[in-house]
Design a protein with these regions (language model features):
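Adenine nucleotide-associated cytosolic modules
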Residues: 1-259
Length: 259
């Protein structure tokens, strides 16, 4: 793929980076990324991936824009309240970069559609806000050998990691960290607990950085590490994630059974 004159100008600040250059930008333009959720995390992920020139971006979300979303879901606007989030996000991304292909999936990700959707993309960025989706993505990205970049939010904190458990030893999955979802109601959702809107922006932007690094093969990966952000104390810290040999998704027994 040869860059056009317009692309040379648009991506000029990428092209002057030795770590990116023309070859890296061509990788981004050829990449296909599925973003799960067009909410607080998904908004900055989508905006930065589109601006960076990720060639095809899939968005899956079955929700509609609500006025309460606009405090943190910056890919949407007041005039789009009531619209499907995937349509609202597509309009915003087209205004940012009309050279990017946006594929919308106005549905809830579930066992009946997830495998077919994920199979069509190179990488999955999880911006969802529920445990069922998180565990479904964990299991299917392992099975389909797709990198999974995932973040989670609480009122003043965020967590972020990258998962490539299909690479074997030293590469844990989400279930190695949290084997099973917590009991229903134990962890309140955003509409119950609240959130400082900019915290979602910080974590979604960091997630976009990790997606771009994964696509470009740059720097250190968060694979095997959980990054935790504490906004009130202005702290980041990292926790190593050990690969669980008994993990029901990627453990030794599972690998032996499927090999």
């Amino acid at each position: 793929m040869e860059l056009t004159e317009e692309q040379f100008q648009r991506y000029a600040r990428h092209l002057i980076l030795d770590e990116v250059g023309e070859e890296g930008q061509e990788k981004l333009l050829a990449a296909r990324v599925l973003v799960v959720g067009a909410g607080g995390l998904g908004s900055p992920i989508l905006l930065y991936l589109a601006a960076a020139g990720v060639g095809t971006i899939g968005i899956i979300d079955d929700d509609r824009v609500d006025l309460t979303n606009l405090q943190r879901q910056i890919v949407h606007a007041t005039k789009r309240v009531g619209e499907l989030k995937v349509d609202s996000a597509r309009a915003t991304l087209a205004a940012v970069n009309d050279g990017v292909r946006i594929e919308t999936h106005p549905m809830r990700l579930g066992p009946d559609n997830a495998a077919d959707l994920i199979a069509g993309y190179d990488l999955v960025a999880d911006g969802s806000d529920n445990f069922a989706t998180r565990y479904l993505l964990t299991d299917l990205c392992y099975r389909l050998k797709k990198p999974l970049i995932a973040a989670a939010l609480s009122p003043f904190e965020g967590q972020l990691s990258s998962f490539r458990p299909y690479l074997g030893d030293g590469h844990p999955c989400y279930r190695c960290l949290f084997r099973e979802p917590p009991p229903p109601g134990l962890v309140p959702r955003c509409e119950e607990a609240g959130i400082l809107g900019a915290v979602a922006g910080v974590m979604g932007t960091l997630e976009a950085v990790e997606v771009l690094k994964e696509l470009l093969g740059l720097g250190d990966s968060l694979d095997g590490t959980l990054l935790i952000y504490d906004a009130l104390r202005v702290r980041f810290h990292r926790i190593r994630i050990a690969k669980d040999p008994d993990c029901p998704t990627c453990g030794v027994t599972v690998g032996a059974a499927t090999s």
